[in-house]
């Protein structure tokens, strides 16, 4: 690859190696996915490694054919009649389809037990689908302090997502029923992971980004399993994963924007050497105000996605330009290496500014304006991912209108054009309160909840908690105690057994 190759096609396979192999590179690239799709894909990533994401729709169609073959003998009889099992699959386990998919025939089931993920929960009905479960794996990799700790959490996740004697009767029966219906299905076993050693260093403990808090929250969610039924626990786990994955993607978008702005400053004459600590604080650490609670957020998410694309396009062009000038460029995988990168720019900015960099960038921005405006491609996919993963599931079926209570975005109104506001559903609140009080032995200040959400880039005013909709929902769920001495007059209570 070369600078000329990049100028011909800046998106497909032409990234500079100093960028492509760095953890700031967003991979896997997110696309459309509902929360059920992310959860089903996580089952496949952690325990069904031999089940390719693209095979799920085909396996679902084959499974459906077997269910509809009422007059044909079953190869292996289950514990219940075929008609009853059909009712379970199509009614009890039914998950809402997107409004534009209502007329399409494919299995859409709630991923309560592992074997459901063999037949349902692919991001696309076609065979060409991305793997949301690998995004969760990537966050575990980035958020853990070492490869050994990442592997330990991955193992704990597999054990918790497995169905064993500690699960309730319904979950054990359901998993056994699916397995008996298709004894030749892919075996459920832990996927072996090759963890990246290049993500960890002395800086890790000093940096603050969503993946770091996510691994702690994931551990807290795993500990909650014994306090509730399987379906309830999957809902809690689902809420934690929804918040973590989207916050991770938006953080990377924000990081790119800040890194590119610092790069522009250096090209314009600002001194590059500010120190790795300052780079960590102002470029890498999460912006605790990415999104505001209760506000309309989709325009902001679009802005983040657009800024990410602009920064990615420009940074890679600059990296290729510096390589053409003979520079040996560091991989952008640490604050120290980012500092070295900025120092190289400072040293060679005269050559960069006198060359074709700025005119080439202007040409690329003009040519790729639809992509940069998120009207197609990567940016559009990021917006779809955030909207459908965080947003409350919409359904044309009245019986499924209340299916999703773990949402983080809710529509203000019934019209198709109604805005999406950042508002937590009841299950999402239970999950977040449990996680922020994971080490608490009793009631704690509501500031812990605000600080916890800020770690994911969500700003919540402490004074608004008691007075607003969030405070009312906390009271309804029995998660607060009135205390005149406490901040805002209320204290948070752990929702589950510690």
What are these model-predicted stretches?
Residues 28, 451-464:
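Short helix-coil junctions and helix-kink-helix linkers
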Residues 423-443:
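Positively charged, polyanion-binding regions of nucleic-acid-associated proteins
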Residues 470-498:
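C-terminal engagement modules used by replication, chromatin/transcription, nuclear envelope/ESCRT
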Residues 222-363:
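Long, internal scaffold/assembly segments composed of regular secondary structure
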Residues 1-123:
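Charged, amphipathic alpha-helical stretches
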Residues 88-273:
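Long, mid-chain structured domain cores
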Residues 339-424:
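Long, low-complexity, charged/polar intrinsically disordered regions in eukaryotic proteins
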Residues 83, 87-88, 320, 336, ...:
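Basic amphipathic alpha-helical segments that dock to polyanions
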């Amino acid at each position: 690859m070369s600078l000329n190759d990049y100028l011909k096609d800046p998106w497909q396979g032409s990234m500079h190696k100093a960028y492509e192999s760095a953890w700031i590179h967003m991979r896997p690239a997110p696309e459309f996915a509902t929360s059920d799709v992310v959860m089903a894909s996580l089952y496949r990533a952690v325990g069904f490694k031999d089940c390719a994401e693209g095979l799920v729709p085909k396996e679902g169609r084959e499974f459906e054919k077997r269910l509809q073959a009422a007059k044909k003998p079953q190869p292996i009889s289950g514990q219940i009649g075929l008609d009853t099992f059909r009712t379970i699959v199509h009614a009890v386990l039914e998950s809402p389809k997107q409004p534009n998919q209502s007329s399409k025939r494919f299995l859409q089931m709630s991923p309560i037990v592992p074997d459901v993920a063999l037949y349902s929960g692919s991001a696309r009905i076609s065979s060409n689908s991305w793997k949301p479960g690998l995004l969760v794996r990537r966050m575990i990799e980035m958020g853990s302090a070492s490869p050994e700790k990442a592997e330990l959490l991955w193992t704990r996740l597999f054990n918790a997502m497995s169905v064993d004697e500690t699960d309730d009767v319904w979950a054990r029966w359901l998993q056994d029923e699916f397995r008996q219906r298709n004894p030749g299905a892919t075996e459920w076993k832990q996927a072996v992971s090759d963890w990246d050693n290049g993500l960890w260093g002395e800086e890790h403990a000093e940096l603050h980004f969503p993946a770091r808090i996510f691994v702690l929250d994931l551990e807290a969610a795993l500990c909650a399993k014994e306090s509730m039924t399987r379906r309830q626990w999957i809902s809690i786990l689902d809420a934690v994963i929804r918040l973590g994955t989207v916050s991770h993607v938006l953080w990377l978008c924000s990081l790119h924007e800040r890194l590119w702005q610092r790069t522009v400053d250096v090209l314009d004459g600002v001194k590059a050497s500010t120190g790795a600590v300052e780079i960590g604080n102002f470029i890498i650490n999460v912006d605790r105000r990415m999104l505001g609670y209760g506000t309309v957020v989709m325009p902001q998410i679009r802005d983040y996605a657009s800024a990410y694309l602009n920064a990615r396009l420009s940074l890679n062009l600059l990296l290729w330009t510096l390589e053409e000038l003979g520079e040996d460029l560091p991989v952008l995988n640490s604050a120290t290496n980012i500092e070295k990168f900025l120092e190289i720019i400072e040293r060679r900015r005269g050559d960069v500014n006198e060359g074709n960099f700025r005119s080439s960038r202007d040409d690329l921005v003009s040519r790729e304006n639809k992509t940069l405006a998120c009207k197609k491609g990567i940016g559009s996919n990021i917006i779809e991912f955030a909207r459908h993963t965080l947003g409350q599931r919409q359904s044309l079926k009245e019986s499924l209108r209340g299916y999703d209570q773990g949402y983080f975005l809710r529509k203000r109104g019934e019209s198709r054009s109604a805005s999406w506001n950042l508002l937590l559903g009841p299950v999402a609140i239970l999950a977040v309160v449990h996680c922020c009080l994971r080490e608490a032995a009793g009631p704690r200040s509501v500031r812990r909840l605000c600080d916890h959400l800020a770690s994911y880039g969500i700003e919540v005013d402490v004074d608004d908690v008691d007075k607003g909709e969030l405070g009312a929902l906390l009271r309804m769920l029995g998660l607060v105690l009135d205390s005149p001495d406490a901040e805002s007059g209320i204290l948070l209570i752990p929702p589950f057994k510690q």
